[in-house]
Amino acid sequence: KNFGLYRERTGALIVCASDAEKLVDIRSQLASIARNLWSTPPAHGAAVVAQILGDEELKALWLDELEGMRLRVASLRRGLVEALAPHGLSERFAHVAEQRGMFSYTGLSPLQVQRLREEFSVYMVGSGRANVAGLDASRLDQLADAIARVCVN
């Protein structure tokens, strides 16, 4: 997803109904509304992308920003693995430096992820998938310490 365009008709709706029959009726109405939205998707995002890719100066700026983000994420990946080295965990997490993209599968267990959340306020999904792009380079040592504590103990 190289063009992340947010606030474009996204969201969630949660419905609580007093009984199953009402829930079926509500679901039917919501499905009808959703079909109309899906049948006519917004064109704004496509127009923005077309304008950027159609203008050499804008395209060059976008490519430069994209490369900057790619390099930043790669640096964060390497930095985390390096920060884990003093804990004897660089081999165990070497795959993190080799992966690509904004997210990484850490290999942490659901219990380790829970401990990171509860004991160190480190948040990721239960599968161990982490948002590398959201890391702060100045806090990689702190993160490595927390990971080491849940992996060793």
Indicate residue ranges for each PLM-predicted region:
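Conserved PLP-binding catalytic core of the aspartate aminotransferase-like
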Residues: L61-E119
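Active-site PLP attachment segment
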Residues: K1-D25
